[in-house]
Amino acid sequence: MNLPKTGFPMRAGLSKSEPKRLKDWQDNKVYEQVLKKNEGHKKFVLHDGPPYANGPIHIGHAMNKISKDMINRYWMMQGYEVPYVPGWDCHGQPIEHKVEEKLGTEKFNQTSTAKIRELCNKFAVENIELQKAGFRRLGVLGDWDNPYLTLYHQHDAADIEVFKAMFDKAMIYRGHKPVHWCKHCHTALAEAEIEYSDETSPSIFVRFEMTSKPAGLENFDGPVDFIIWTTTPWTIPSDQAVSLKPGAAYVAVEHEGRAEVMLEDLAPKCCEEFGWEYTPVMVDGKPYVVPAETFHHIHYKQPIFDGVEGVALLADYVGVDDGTGIVHNSPGHGVDDYFACLKEGITDICMPVDDDGKFYTGEEFGTGGPFSGMDTDEANPHIIEFLRERGTLVLEKKITHSYPHCWRCKHPVLFRATDQWFVSMDKTGLREQAGKEVRENVKWYPAHAANRIGAMVEQRPDWCISRQRNWGVPIPSYTCADCGEKVMNDATLDAVIKLFHEKGSDAWFTDAPESYLGEACVCPKCGGHHLKADKDILDVWWDSGVSWKAVCEYRPELEYPADVYLEGSDQHRGWFQSSLLTSVGANGHAPYKAVVSQGFTLDGQGRKMSKSLGNVIDPNKVCDEMGADIIRLWVASVDTSSDVSIDHEILARTSDAYRRFRNTLRFLLSELEGQFEPETDGVAFADLLPLDKLMVARLTQVQAEVDDAYASYEFPRAYRALYDFVVTELSNVYLDALKDRLYCDKPGSLERRSAQTVLAELFSMLMRDLQPILSYTVDEAMAYAPAGCVDHQKYAALLDWYKSPITVDEANEFEGVLEASLELRSAVTKALEDARSVGTFTKSQQVRVKAVVPAEMYALLTGDKAVDLAEFYIVSDVELTQGEELSVAIEAAEGECCDRCWNYRTTVGEYNGHAHICKRCADAL
């Protein structure tokens, strides 16, 4: 008997074997070998979105990096030169916050900027090494010894090169407008740095008394009020206007001698909530209902500061579903308010809150007045009580609503009008061009992601790119010490670029401007030569967003635009967008040809992972206990285009799937290792047995599906095609049917060599199709494989992509025979199960099948591509006749049971010395 035999272990022992294999890859520079093998070929560049250098890797990191590695390994096998340069995002408030925690706030505030930056640098580098080890352990190939870091000198310089390119196009300007402000971190924030979560806030309705009466109410005896609604009482001290909905109808409701103006559609609901009777003011016998325009430019008393007046405006953003249909405007604390007031010529913007979120001290408008020195949150109840005492508070209640929070410290943020640097979205057409790139020149996976980022670009405000922190790349602006003029021009920018290339951005905080500006150290306004370097730094999204310049353009092994970016879906408003805007702004086109976005990792119940819930899956721990290939297989199996779930139960199921793949590879090796070499023992396709031709046709179809799935970044489609093929078609059907030939035929016979040829094709295909997923396991199998099955290579990463001996079109010609054979097999299997259940037969080889099949099926099953059905169904004989409908009958097979192959044959006992075996087995012996 040709019993299966291989040295490839049944038990994987991944947690112990993988680290040894990883060391071998590193010692023998496998990544460099792959680059060398494909050197000079067309390049494929997946540009790595830099993870933040803050703490060990988590399961989201693992999904991200493994996905990238699967893509890269696929294109490597396709013959492309695939340089992969991993990177890290090193600047920003989170690292600075960690340093502040370590030093303590008091000591931190006393520490020099240069020292803080030194400590931040140290923290980032230490965490990079921690994360790098985690990523390498996952089996990710790349230039790990030469990654890109956003703290490198050339990256600092690239920041300013892109800044200059956009500054020269008048895309960058300095302005005074409301921006998200974190009073805890003392810095402006961009929209991408904002997270929304539920917050309970005071909800108040307040009357603002008009100083003149609107048309139609001139004869009303009592005061006339606007009733406004707000959830931020702390903004009322800076109120400068109220806004009504253009074209909407407003009604005046009479209450205790006052006319209270509200949106007509909301007034009945409001009156009920206030405990008022809904009694409209009557004018000429009719309820006083007028359009919003009636109140345009009507003035009212500022509710906090006596002698100060506000004005009524019209604004489209006013909602008509909640509140009163009238909102108060504090242009220093809201973007909509700011633009509504600006449109009406209100340019003297009130901003009574300092960097710490506290009201300035003073008594006049523009300070905190009665609330001087109070934090905005602290002031809320005091302001409410103040309004109550004045008799202007109509109603107070609590409301839970979505509110913006700082992405790092998690504290609620506020809007503050401050002097900041902005990228204009419209002045030079950046919004339009970026939107065009999204729609026309970039492929998005999934396709609907184009709509998401397109809408974000369409709706986003100007980009606030300045931050008031220490750890980042400085905005290259100066202030003249003599006249206060801001100084920035091509000469100063070129000098800064040169400085950063040579010394990095730390030099901004240590070197005097005159030491490197030379003749550029002059104020164009007053001619003074005393320039002071400003302290604002660039938004970290700018910093990472120019990596296309600092990495893809600067590094000769890469290309710009990159072939693909892949990150989480949150990067539509983060790195995808900052990269898009800087690249389009500087060069007029997107930095990527395709973008793949992924969802978030959740637990098995669809919840976010947190230590408090005890549902965190640590990839390092999984590697130590189960192996990295289990995580890799999980990543391949789930649809990462949306949120995905992972827990210990899911990983256990993944381990079961892993065993299916491993056992299949092991079975194939057990019939090939030391027994078969395709280059000397292989059988040409034309000479294969019919069943083997059928399997080659089927593997060709599966291979085409897997190829298309990988090329389309649809990993679960590749996984599902392979899993179903291995489990349903190979293990349960073909390999089972083949065992008779493999075990019992002569070792060198055509029948056995035909079977082994197909096993070699299957092995070659699976090794390549699984290599991007089960990188460690496939590499392990290389040592046991026939050399011709693995391109005579030692490492799996060096394999070329599988090429079937026939085309897909040729394979499709076998589809009818396969479908007919499988349809009849189902009927035969049921008949066998029925017979077993009543004890008629115990083994399928005891059976002879008599089947009646329709004409079309009969033609397929007896035609030139027909297979040996007895072998396929593992029975001793199959007799086919043509009829109207499919039916199957089984009976006892003719002859006797061969003791060697267990088939029933009439030739058993015909050969001397072999009384109990059939002719085929006697010949084999």
Predicted features along the sequence, with ranges:
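N-terminal, positively charged nucleic-acid-binding surface of large information/translation enzymes
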Residues: 1-258, 330-343, 348-363, 390-432, ...
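Structured ligand/cofactor/substrate-binding pocket environments in proteins
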Residues: 60-72, 79, 88-89, 155-158, ...
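Acidic, turn-prone loop/beta-hairpin segments
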Residues: 89, 179, 183, 189-195, ...
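Core structural elements
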Residues: 135, 158, 463, 656-669, ...
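Residues immediately within or flanking Cys/His clusters that coordinate Zn2+
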Residues: 179, 403, 477, 520, ...
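Short cysteine-rich clusters marking metal-coordination/redox-active sites
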Residues: 182, 406, 480, 523-526, ...
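Cys/His-coordinated zinc-binding microdomains
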Residues: 186, 468, 484, 527, ...
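C-terminal accessory/binding modules appended to enzymatic or scaffolding proteins
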Residues: 311-313, 884-917
